[in-house]
Amino acid sequence: IGAGPGGIFSAFELMKKSPETRVAVFEEGNTLEKRKCPIDGKKVKSCIKCPTCAIMNGFGGAGAFSDGKYNITNDFGGTLYEYIGRDQAINLMKYVDTINTSHGGEETHMYSTAGTKFKTLCMQNKLKLLDASVRHLGTDINYVVLENMYNEMKDHIDFYFNTPVSNIEVIDGGYRVFYKDEYMDCDKCIVSVGRSGSKWIENVCQKLEIPTKSNRVDIGVRVELPAVIFSHLTDELYESKIVYRTEKFEDLVRTFCMNPNGIVVNENTNGIVTVNGHSYEGAEKQTENTNFALLVAKHFSEPFKDSNGYGESIARLSNMLGGGVIVQRFGDLMRGRRSTEKRIEEGLVKPTLAATPGDLSLVLPKRILDGIIEMIYALDKIAPGTANDDTLLYGVEVKFYNMEVEIDNNLETRYKGLYIIGDGSGVTHSLSHASASGVYVARKIIEEM
């Protein structure tokens, strides 16, 4: 259930290693070529909240139109290694990389933090650079890879597009999957519904009495600035995952999803418009700006457990004030005033997303905003110009994490043959980890045949 990275790679592995196995994939969204967001920058300038978001749903999942970064590391992107072991997790991510590079990504570059001088530079300025090897496909090549994989799979696997699954029931010898006014029985069921399926998976777990526990939510902004400011980092590392501990509250703030010469985009999750970023491998689609997120993770304990609800309420406030995403100059934020169209037009950084000028201090909680401001000044020490007045901040960016589902080392629930994988499990938070979890479960199923 779900044709995102986890679902695709589990189905692909079953097709390759066990071709006699009948596999059906149910996907709420459309085929890859029919996934079209109506925003064109002309007639439709902002999100119109389609019932099924073409950016978030469909073949390829939310990652289909991402910048296609596959981080091969256990340091971030999920806790898959806690279930299957560090070595196996890395080996599976490397295997996923071979699939991507053999389906259109062979000319793309692998970046690495190994031996970089920037680790020392970060440490000298109270920052930490996390270790990773990064395969950057780019939004354009990522699409090609998915297209090639689908073309290889479509004649061997039964795909049901525009077909949301309403319920799963346990029956003798397997599971009954309900969709529209029909149902299908199966021996094994792999649930891979991603972050956009968070409410759905929560309901399924409640009905089947599968234990879950609260996860975190990441809240922050997307920063956009001239690409030359970060070029000394991005030319060598492409993406740098940098962590800072704030002096005021000792909260951790981190960079996320860095897009050199990229664009800022809207994202619709459960009817709420947030912000994200993309980048392209092809020079013809590149811009003069680089963007990245600055995020603060919030964990909650008793009595409050709804971390996603907390993030949604902040995003809704942004939508209420700005009709969608708000953009603000850093200089305006520090002067305690909202940005205006005139000041943004006069600025040195030309926005790549049509957003509403406003005041993010009316949206973000003070503790989170203080942490982001501290981080910007810390980054300014390793990338001078980050804290320039004309640096743009888009808000809000929220990364929702599913409730962490109770699964065993096979990624299997308390029900034999019912697996929950990818970001929908709350265990993975990245393309590489989600894809690796799909391969892992497919191999476990084949072992049991």
What is the meaning of each model-derived region?
Residues 1-77, 111-116, 120-449:
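Residues forming the flavin
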Residues 58-108:
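Dinucleotide-binding Rossmann-like beta1-alpha1 core, especially the glycine-rich loop
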